[in-house]
Amino acid sequence: MIRRPPRSTPLYSSAASDVYKRQSMIAPNSNNPGRVLAIAVFLAGLIQLTFLMPFLKSFNRFPTPRWGWNDQGVKRIIKLMIPSMIGSSASQFNLLFNTLIASFLSAGSISWIYYSDRLLEFPVGVFGVALSTVVLPTLSRESANQDISTFKSTLDWGIKIALIISVPSAVGLFILSGPLIATIFLGGNFTNYDLDMTQYSLMAYSFGLIGLCLVLVLSPAFYSREDAKTPLRFGLIAMSCNAVCSLLFVLSLVWLGVNYPHIGLALAFSIASIINASLLARELINQNLVLLDKSFLYLISRVIIATLAMSAFLLGFNQENSIWISSGITERIFSLLFLIGVSVIIYFGVLFLLGFRFKEIRIKSKIKKYNIKNLILYICF
């Protein structure tokens, strides 16, 4: 009898490797902390891989390398993999291009872009990737079974969850950009000026969060049907838009004498992400796989109203950067947690007052219950 390993095994291995990385970052008396961190990242990945091997072997799934290049299945996977890699990496290519452009700007521009991108990628990694991980296998199974009705239901569920989470998160990231950066990064070589410059780019990045999360949900709708060319085509369009907008915005801001032209790079990234998501959504609508019916539009309207209520609270109670700078680290942490906690309560409270119930996003497909549990586990870890 094959024994199934715990479904949370990858999460525990990831947590174990993350602990190792964190411990290495605070290694005492290190003359070269950069080298220590680089080695720690490598060892953390090795630990994670080693942790998974016994569980793979326990249910006869331990990989044995065999180069079956002539196998039809391998050829099909390679044919799908190459365009999928490029299409799904559009945002990473955009970030790499923006980093290249930032290298020609004032000193510190690369760091400002990097720090703000890290804060943007956190909710994407926590919510967007977790949602994509849960949705993809379900869509693949339903596509293989030619069950279009449940395929639509799963996709609709993923889109609604992505919007319910990403819209308020983007607005919160915009309003709380200063407090977040001050709490996490301020101190040492990271000066008040760096705080202001990083805040500008994070504010421009924030609305790209919606596009990034939607891309992570919409792309599996194509990959699950073995259509890798459509996301590739739209990804290339998004990369082209990012390149053109980045150069246009940066050159315009430099010509105008603005002291923070790197904000143009972040703004171009957000625009490209939204364009990519919009193209994917339009294609799915044309294929009658996504329906913008009254219930969907009604849900979006309530999300917007609840987000506005949350924004009013944050704008009213958030303080200027100078106050955050003068506060101690403990006070910053508790103040930030208070603002985030209350804003979450206000957001979902207003949603429920407007008649929202979780049954509206109850999945109607044959998705297994453990996939929902895995979504929660991925988010928690």
Question: Residue locations for each model-derived region?
Answer:
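Membrane-interface junctions at transmembrane-helix termini in multi-pass inner-membrane proteins
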Residues: 4, 17, 207-237, 247-248
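Interfacial segments at transmembrane-helix termini and the short loops linking adjacent helices
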Residues: 174-208, 259, 325-330
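Interhelical loop/hinge segments that connect adjacent transmembrane helices in multipass membrane
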Residues: 34-38, 53-91, 285-303, 361-363
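Interfacial/gating helices of multi-pass transporter permease domains
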Residues: 34, 80, 102-122, 191-199, ...
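Helix-loop junctions and terminal segments of transmembrane helices
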Residues: 129-147, 218-219
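Membrane-proximal transmembrane or re-entrant/amphipathic helices at the cytosolic face
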Residues: 291-292, 316-381
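Single conserved hydrophobic/aromatic residue that forms the stacking wall/gate
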Residues: 1-23
